[in-house]
A protein has these predicted regions:
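Hydrophobic alpha-helical segments, chiefly the membrane-spanning helices
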Residues: 1-314
Length: 314
């Protein structure tokens, strides 16, 4: 039991550190290839923050623990919308960008509803996964197109600012990519192995472990970043990133994972999937009050999360 808990702890550290190193290396390569900053931010950096969820879910599915794979995604999305947004609003009221209310939250809600409908038969087939991934490509196209337009408008009105940051050496960026991938793969295997054994030892389902321990572990960076952003008054960007992560989790991660290996669900219930939908809907409703999420609304989100955890574990 102690060894398996150690596997979980070491695994999550390797996964998180590996994702960070992989992202640094990939960004450095992209900059050397003269990719626009907006494209780097919306693709490499955004995907890098979701690499822990992706690797853990993919490894879980390949090992046959599909409840752990799907539970990780569903649990991460619930964790993001209820706990991260809730705690961040508790720290400081969150100002929501209009684009987030009009585009990001509705699309996250749409993705959640689509996943719920697909899971009604207890399976995520290759066809289901293919549809999810096509929707992800549509989302990325619309997002990049909109962001590029905004960037063109901004650069037309402002003077270029010289970037004084020293670029990473080419050899070092390649090293970080290789090291990051190795840590992600090794850490994911350790994490999944430890989580599976702990579930067997304490007599709970893999789905519960995925919805709680695994989801919480892979979402810790978003929690820390969002709370710090809220304290610094940058909550609008933080909540947009959290919701963007939710869309990526469902459409890209489950899309790719499901195409590689179809997933049969046993422990993931309609309660879990419905909570994912309801949590997104709550954030959307709260955001209409002057485009802010007040402290009391953050407390409500946090209480709902705690209540869900209690029901899930007992």
């Amino acid at each position: 039991m102690i060894l398996n808990v150690l596997f979980i702890l070491v695994g999550i550290v390797l996964v998180l550190w590996g994702a960070d190193r992989l992202t640094d290396g990939a960004v450095a390569v992209a900059e050397k290839l003269k990719m626009p900053q907006i494209v780097i931010g919306l693709t490499i950096v955004a995907m890098g923050t979701s690499m822990p969820e992706f690797c853990v879910s993919l490894v879980s599915a390949l090992k046959g623990t599909t409840d752990l794979a799907v539970g990780n995604i569903v649990g991460s999305n619930i964790f993001n919308t209820l706990l991260i947004v809730g705690v961040s609003a508790w720290v400081a009221p969150m100002t929501i960008l209009k684009s987030t209310v009009r585009k990001d939250i509705p699309f996250a809600l749409f993705a959640s509803v689509i996943l719920l409908i697909m899971c009604l038969d207890g399976n995520i087939s290759r066809l289901d996964a293919g549809i999810l991934f096509v929707l992800f490509l549509v989302f990325m196209y619309v997002t990049l197109k909109g962001a590029k337009t905004k960037e063109d408008d901004t650069t037309a009105k402002t003077e270029p600012i010289e970037d004084k940051k020293k670029p990473m050496a080419a050899w070092l960026s390649i090293v970080w990519i290789i090291v990051g991938l190795a840590c992600l793969i090794g850490g994911s295997n350790l994490f999944v192995e430890g989580a599976t054994k702990v579930a067997e030892h304490i007599g709970v389902s893999e789905a519960v472990i995925g919805l709680t321990i695994v989801a919480g572990g892979t979402s810790l960076p978003e929690l820390a970043t969002s709370v710090v952003s809220a304290r610094k008054g940058n909550s609008g960007i933080a909540i947009g990133n959290v919701l963007g992560s939710n869309v990526f989790n469902i459409l890209a991660i489950l899309g790719v994972t499901g195409v590689i290996t179809p997933m049969h669900l046993q422990g993931i219930t309609m309660l879990d999937l419905s909570m994912m939908v309801v949590s997104t809907l709550l954030v959307w409703l709260f955001s209409f009050t002057k485009y802010k999420i007040a402290r009391w609304e953050g407390i409500v989100l946090t209480i709902v999360f705690i209540g869900y955890m209690v029901v899930l574990c007992y």
